Swiss-Prot record, chain A:
Ubiquitin-like modifier involved in autophagosomes formation. May mediate the delivery of the autophagosomes to the vacuole via the microtubule cytoskeleton. GO terms for biological process: autophagosome assembly; autophagosome maturation; cellular response to nitrogen starvation; mitophagy; protein transport. The keyword Heme does not apply. Interacts with ATG4. Residues 1-14 have a biased composition (Basic and acidic residues). It comes from the Eukaryota. One of its GO terms (cellular component) is cytoplasmic vesicle. Keywords: Autophagy, Cytoplasm, Cytoplasmic vesicle, Cytoskeleton, Lipoprotein, Membrane, Microtubule, Protein transport, Transport, Ubl conjugation pathway, Vacuole. This is Putative autophagy-related protein 8E.
From Swiss-Prot, chain B:
Disulfide bonds: none annotated. The active site is at residues 164, 361, 363. The lineage of its organism: Eukaryota, Viridiplantae, Streptophyta, Embryophyta, Tracheophyta. It catalyses: [protein]-C-terminal L-amino acid-glycyl-phosphatidylethanolamide + H2O = [protein]-C-terminal L-amino acid-glycine + a 1,2-diacyl-sn-glycero-3-phosphoethanolamine. It comes from Oryza sativa subsp. japonica. This is Cysteine protease ATG4B. The gene is ATG4B. Keywords: Autophagy, Cytoplasm, Hydrolase, Protease, Protein transport, Thiol protease, Transport, Ubl conjugation pathway.
Amino acid sequence: MEERRKEKGKEGRRGKATGHSVDKFSRSNLPEMEKRKLHLPPGTALFVFVNNTLPQTAQLMGSVYESYKDEGDGFLYLCYSSEKTFG
Amino acid sequence: MTSLPDRGVSSSSSDPLCEGNIAPCSSSSEQKEDCSLKQSKTSILSCVFNSPFNIFEAHQDSSANKSPKSSSGSYDWSRVLRRIVCSGSMWRFLGTSKVLTSSDVWFLGKCYKLSSEESSSDSDSESGHATFLEDFSSRIWITYRRGFDAISDSKYTSDVNWGCMVRSSQMLVAQALIFHHLGRSWRRPLEKPYNPEYIGILHMFGDSEACAFSIHNLLQAGNSYGLAAGSWVGPYAMCRAWQTLVRTNREQHEVVDGNESFPMALYVVSGDEDGERGGAPVVCIDVAAQLCCDFNKGQSTWSPILLLVPLVLGLDKINPRYIPLLKETFTFPQSLGILGGKPGTSTYIAGVQDDRALYLDPHEVQMAVDIAADNIEADTSSYHCSTVRDLALDLIDPSLAIGFYCRDKDDFDDFCSRATELVDKANGAPLFTVVQSVQPSKQMYNQDDVLGISGDGNINVEDLDASGETGEEEWQIL
């Protein structure tokens, strides 16, 4: 049951919680991510996706988890993305 | 990408590439759809189609009738198409093409009703098209240029093949300045002398360090966000570069002459520099008020404000649920359009029709021109384009930035109420949200009662044994 609360990312930048996060943070807003931990240099964009949409910053983790947890494995999958460039 | 010769550029330093031409792109855009990724970013196809189809015969500069140099023999097929275009009624051709259908066009907050092609002789219909095209071609068009002074220490005297995001952002900010100084209903006059405000705006976007918002100065200001001559850049970094440049200019001008170079507050709607939550951006009314207050040097009155909202709306491609919301932003009277386009190809998207974006394309190469700040007789034709280009909204890259200009407090309030309505239509996934004030981050630990949260009865309290862990350890990168 512990695993269901892991968070996992894809798209090159992966994030995971060490279990318990959704319980502990269920009344918290989305966690503040530090760019250096995602190997993003300062000054780059950071966007977090749940179910391929941007979660509302004021949403509580508990409700995000309940809405979007994976039905199969109980994980809440978060994806992190920076931005594309144009020329 | 291969670097192509600067096709479509005449030796004239003010080549009116698109002047007076309309929408032969109805076919070119289709072509581009198929092969744009393989094509050079200099939009050779669009140049090919820049032969002078004069819709506004009476309004033409004589220069618009020059033959373009781009119709080389290798593009004979284009002449066939051109003949097709020329032989039929232009309106009928447009009406059956995908560039302009009979549906309503929303263009920078203004709606144009275009009738169907059957009524091509109908004066109302034509005026619908004509008034739209007059509006479209009055927007400031900023493109790749070559032949300018080298950018700082680099050897770059041209931004061909790398400057499109910078150019797109210049177009958006130029529109903000046009709206501010001249109003949304301003149209480019048919005759000189021009408005001093209009010339003054064009001067600011000239290609030299002496011009406030030149590519030279933007790259320098955006250095810490990865902007550099020759490098591609994303919309978020571009917005931050503008923020830095405007701040720097403001400080310098206060020291030098006390004048404002940028006549409005600038709000880049995004999180902090280092730590961000990364969700949908939040327009905070208190932050906007503070920025206006700072702009007014401490007086607590409102000021005009430019909002830039950088976004990423999907991982690999744009999530289609955002498209109706993006379209709706063009109905806001505050709309300044969008920086973005197909992957790798930034444009200035200024309008929408059906499921297609209408844009101004920076991927044309023109010679740099110097428009003196007070030269109201200047040739400004290279800063306008009558060629309406389009692309399917679902093909745009998820990385983009939306702009809004709010003239005063009432206008800002109107923007906020429209944005809030749009949140309600978003079915849980808005582009951005509006709040009154910044809430301190909620980091409450649920030591006792996770079941108190409605709907979370499935969370197992027994696993709550790690309360000693710090927040940092809770969020590891896989």
